[in-house]
């Protein structure tokens, strides 16, 4: 086990290291795997072999580059101005050489990338062989100390120093990486590179100029000797500055004439130096020109585009208003590009998952408020957001033209626009649309020409959705398509506009004739209470027992709405009158709970029974609503109101919690058991005792006496003095909440995810069910952690016999404040009624305890 844990830790460390390496954005720091192959960076290298892309090794390389900069200055300087080593330069040189000697040794342990296979080679023999036949000799020679070179030849000191310039290759690799690194500005990196090249060229030329003069047999006949007599006796600093001065004037082609070549050697060197300057100047000018042109290319392209658009408009005699729209759109496009708002180009370069996440973050909250998508699932909304395209429109530009083909619809993100009617020959503004409104949806959904021209009033940002893409998504989400269509029709009905009224009638006729491209189902027709459309769809062969995501069939919906014609049509086409939805509801119950007596009668005539559904749930619902008439109607139609719902809660449990004595009497007459436990172990008698319902307790005692039923208690459960089993905290479930706070079981979440199967049948459901005790009872600890504690409180100084049932606060201070507020005293003590013991900590209070508040007096 320990070995496995160690191996797991090593793998985790390796993954973390690789993740850290992969966090760099430089294009040159990673290896692209071949097609179909995994990344080579996931391959663990052999022992003592370092990856060339290792983060620590990259830091070492950066440190060596700093030493290379020193070498680039000191090597030409020592070659030109010094004949033998001088401290402190000689000491510094040896320290630098020592670091590069360490790098030579380290290179034998650094893997390399095979250019043919693009794999990292970690075989140390192959690494050594490749290094020995490539750079090893030059690296070794460049690290020979100056003192050793002097022993070979007194004239070899400067030459050995020049061999160290071999290290400059590291600087070139560094600049190549920096140019691709997003953390550094490309323009300034290129400028820094050009400056370094120029300074190095000037420095080398100055050292060579002085070397030629210093080694001449006649110092007076040299470029520096002609102006400075006995220049060898001048300070080293003065000689270096003079050499740099002549080198820079020659490079810049200024040529003041104060310094010039005197002897033949100097003339020859000057010729080649000026030829080199021609190439260097061309290189510098070319690079700077490229950088400047790149920075102004957008402006140049914009001017060319504007000029081309203007020429096109004049050549084709376009009206002034259309010309203005063209130029305004091009100017806006240039502005968005120059300000970094070219979002579509940026999004198109990203993977779909990242695009979807960005769109969800930016636009989901906006689309969630659009009337057309009210009530659709999160799945559909997420898919639609991912396909939205953001666009900018300048003021007074036409977004949609009247009577054009419906190819797109738009959602206004910000700005305002006008709906313009131009059918009459004169333009008239119908209404104004603002941020959050949708435009063009009628044409897209109904596949008819656009009703109005949409013209922006000021700068607008819109989200565009293509019709084909939209319909493809809807085809895969038929239930949501029904909701969208219903939202559209409801919106048209609420507008109270003559034009929209005609559109509504036309759409309803198209629906009835089945000429809509959207996938329509029977549930949609039942929701619309449209028996003509329902009949049309049934004649097409649609299954009358089809269900939505919650298992509700068209017959459920029609019965709930009381649409008798729709119910008769569905039954005529053999719809199942006893079909159940996901909550156990049947059409007969839907009609009963809404009070549609005619529909109830028709369903009963066609064989519908209340027992086909979850009668226990129906009875509890009637008890929660306090509807005794509905409860009697369940019994009238053959339902057993004593049956519990899935949680074990019966209608009697609920009636006791609601303190509905009449309903309790009726349920007892129907044979309800006062000792029947729910899944938490609570019986109706326990609830009546704990909640202090004296009338109900008396009713239970009378009923128990009549039936002579004795309550059997388990010895494993502690007994309270009241004679009621201590079953832990009773959970106030939605099934037995007061009716004023209860939400009907038929109300569903508007943003619920689509149900695929029952949760209880999933792995998570199985595991969750295992945590519930088989006998439905919970220990004291479980009751305290899973549910709040309820206690009965009373005051010793008040005439309060029954007390009040409250939830136990979280602290003793809050408990004292609760007692003070409830009884109008300054409570300072809390005692347990059972043993008269004073309590000073809420942790010792159990569920069901009776607490007495008292003052110091």
Swiss-Prot record:
A single MF term (Gene Ontology): inward rectifier potassium channel activity
Tissue specificity statement from the Swiss-Prot or TrEMBL entry: Preferentially expressed in the peripheral cell layers of root mature including root cortex and root hairs. Detected also, at a lower level, in the mesophyll of the leaves and at restricted sites corresponding to hydathodes and guard cells.
Induction context: In roots, strongly reduced after 2,4-dichlorophenoxyacetic acid (2,4-D) treatment and weakly reduced after benzyladenine (BA) treatment. In shoots, strongly reduced after abscisic acid (ABA) treatment and induced after benzyladenine (BA) treatment.
CDD domains in the record: CAP_ED (cd00038)
Subcellular location: Cell membrane
Occurrences of domain KHA (ranges): 790-857
Keyword Ion transport among UniProt keywords: yes
Residue ranges, Extracellular side: 83-90, 156-158, 215-241, 262-265
Post-translational events: Phosphorylated by CIPK proteins CIPK6, CIPK16 and CIPK23. The activation by phosphorylation is induced by low K(+) conditions and stimulates K(+) uptake and relocation. Dephosphorylation by AIP1 repressed the transport activity.
Domain commentary: The segment S4 is probably the voltage-sensor and is characterized by a series of positively charged amino acids. The pore-forming region H5 is enclosed by the transmembrane segments S5 and S6 in the Shaker-type (1P/6TM) and contains the GYGD signature motif which seems to be involved in potassium selectivity. The KHA domain (rich in hydrophobic and acidic residues) present in the C-terminal part is likely to be important for tetramerization.
Function as written in the Swiss-Prot or TrEMBL entry: Highly selective inward-rectifying potassium channel that mediate potassium uptake by plant roots in response to low K(+) conditions, by a calcium-, CBL-, and CIPK-dependent pathway. Positively regulated by phosphorylation by CIPK23. Negatively regulated by a kinase-independent regulatory mechanism involving a competing direct binding of CBL10. Involved in the stomatal regulation by monitoring the turgor pressure in guard cells. Assuming opened or closed conformations in response to the voltage difference across the membrane, the channel is activated by hyperpolarization.
Entry similarity comment: Belongs to the potassium channel family. Plant (TC 1.A.1.4) subfamily.
Protein name: Potassium channel AKT1
Name of encoding gene: AKT1
